[in-house]
């Protein structure tokens, strides 16, 4: 087989591929074996008609078309490898020469990864986030723990304070008329949560249990119900119940109740240790992200829209998988959030473009620095996957090979190695807590 590649536009390559006659003949024979099982040729049992009779029955062009479908996918993949072409989309195939007894010649026009012009990527200054954990950090985390384990007490009397959980009846009016969806009874509202129209919850502060209150608000201009957007409204609200969090005292008894520790000091030490672990991971990530961002900022690349669209679909797929773990699908999510698939695609595009550019720059650096995944690293990654899915590593490897995913795994490993390379070659500046 012969293959040539010519860049005809900035991100478009034209492959010309010639497949030798012998291989075409082999494919024709394969096509015959496939077709003969599918047709009933008069005078012959199904699957037993000779090739010439099958050709007469279905037509030489039909049989040759089947042969072409057998040849092209493999020949195209071989041509990509031979010419080191990296496609980002499906090719447009044009047959130049296609008839029995001759070599098959076809052209494949394909959009490819753009060329990256790297800037300086060594010795760039990167700020490392502070990994300091202060006494104030520990106290804040302790307060959150205290809040999570608070008891809810129903008040017999009193007035609403911030963070109280209330049960309210309300009816909303616009232009003096009650509107659809503006009425509820015994609605649970945490005052100060910001879940209601701006200004609604603030006007409930100080209202006593059992009282009725008239609340005046204006619907936001971007409110989802167009008939209410931007309009002033009045809500008649009755306070049926007030519940308030009762915080436990921060002492040894509290530590025993909420943890495996016997004393408050031991609990604080454990909180500090865990906060430090998080801070150190955050600091490490800040250096890695900073090193990549600095290298990407110095590079120049024009990203094809097809690559951004593909990345958006990957992100949507990941989102769908995460939602499925919570028991809902994308359609339900869009219904709950009053959005659509197109809205989500548009919102995802900026992040998708950033991710694609990062990957392209990392791949370009890997090529220049000859950074690749070793066989040992690939085996380790496959072993991790095997342990996660609880299957034999060799079965996982074969599955990945069949799905064409092994290359992606090696690419991910190489990218991680490039990130470490950038970190090792960066000028790391220690940040402060204020940063």
UniProtKB/Swiss-Prot annotation:
Main localization category: cytoplasm
Localization, UniProt: Cytoplasm
Top EC class, one word: isomerase
GO-annotated cellular components: cytoplasm
Keywords: Cell cycle, Cell division, Chaperone, Cytoplasm, Isomerase, Rotamase
Listed GO MF terms: peptidyl-prolyl cis-trans isomerase activity; protein folding chaperone; ribosome binding
Signal peptide annotation: none
Annotated catalysed reactions: [protein]-peptidylproline (omega=180) = [protein]-peptidylproline (omega=0)
Biological-process GO terms, alphabetical: 'de novo' cotranslational protein folding; cell division; chaperone-mediated protein folding; protein transport; protein unfolding
InterPro entries: PPIase_dom_sf, PPIase_FKBP_dom, Trig_fac, Trigger_fac_C, Trigger_fac_C_sf, Trigger_fac_ribosome-bd_bac, Trigger_fac_ribosome-bd_sf, Trigger_fact/SurA_dom_sf
Domain PPIase FKBP-type stretches: 163-248
EC number: 5.2.1.8
Protein family according to the UniProt entry: Belongs to the FKBP-type PPIase family. Tig subfamily.
Function, as annotated: Involved in protein export. Acts as a chaperone by maintaining the newly synthesized protein in an open conformation. Functions as a peptidyl-prolyl cis-trans isomerase.
Domain-level remarks: Consists of 3 domains; the N-terminus binds the ribosome, the middle domain has PPIase activity, while the C-terminus has intrinsic chaperone activity on its own.
Name of the featured protein: Trigger factor
């Amino acid at each position: 087989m012969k293959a040539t590649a010519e860049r005809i536009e900035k991100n478009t390559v034209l492959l010309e591929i010639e497949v030798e006659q012998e291989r075409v003949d082999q494919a024709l024979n394969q096509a015959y074996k496939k077709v003969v099982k599918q047709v009933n040729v008069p005078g012959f049992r199904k699957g037993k008609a000779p090739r010439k009779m099958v050709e007469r029955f279905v037509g030489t062009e039909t049989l040759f078309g089947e042969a072409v479908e057998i040849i092209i996918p493999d020949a195209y993949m071989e041509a990509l490898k031979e010419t080191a072409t990296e496609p980002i989309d499906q090719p447009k195939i044009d047959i130049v020469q296609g008839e029995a007894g001759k070599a098959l010649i076809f052209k494949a026009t394909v959009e490819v990864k753009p060329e990256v012009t790297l800037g300086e990527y060594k010795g760039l200054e990167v700020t490392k986030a502070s990994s300091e954990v202060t006494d104030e950090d520990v106290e804040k985390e302790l307060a959150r723990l205290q809040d999570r384990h608070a008891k809810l007490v129903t008040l017999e009397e009193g007035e609403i304070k911030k963070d109280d959980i209330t049960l309210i009846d309300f009816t909303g009016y616009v232009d003096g008329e009650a509107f659809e969806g503006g009425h509820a009874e015994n609605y649970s509202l945490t005052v100060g949560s910001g879940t209601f129209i701006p200004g609604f919850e603030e006007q409930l502060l100080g209202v006593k249990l059992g009282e009725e209150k008239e609340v005046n608000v204006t619907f936001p201009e971007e409110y989802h119900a167009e008939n209410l957007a931007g309009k002033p409204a009045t809500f008649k609200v009755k306070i049926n119940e007030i519940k308030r969090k009762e915080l436990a005292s921060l002492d040894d008894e509290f530590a025993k109740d909420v943890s495996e520790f016997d004393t408050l000091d031991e609990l604080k030490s454990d909180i500090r240790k865990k906060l430090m672990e998080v801070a150190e991971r955050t600091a490490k990530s800040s250096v890695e992200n900073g090193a990549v961002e600095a290298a990407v900022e110095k590079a120049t690349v024009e990203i094809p829209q097809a690559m951004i669209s593909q990345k958006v679909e990957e992100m949507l797929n990941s989102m769908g998988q995460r939602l499925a773990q919570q028991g809902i699908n994308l359609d339900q999510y869009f219904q709950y959030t009053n959005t659509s698939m197109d809205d989500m695609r548009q919102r995802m595009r900026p992040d998708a473009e950033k991710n694609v550019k990062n990957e392209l720059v990392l791949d370009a650096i890997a090529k220049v620095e000859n950074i690749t995944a070793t066989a040992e690293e690939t085996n380790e990654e496959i072993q991790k996957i095997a342990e996660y899915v609880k299957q034999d590593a060799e079965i996982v490897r074969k599955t990945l090979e069949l799905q064409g995913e092994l290359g992606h795994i090696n690419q991910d490993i190489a990218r991680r190695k490039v990130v470490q390379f950038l970190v090792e070659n960066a000028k790391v500046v220690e940040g402060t807590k204020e940063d």
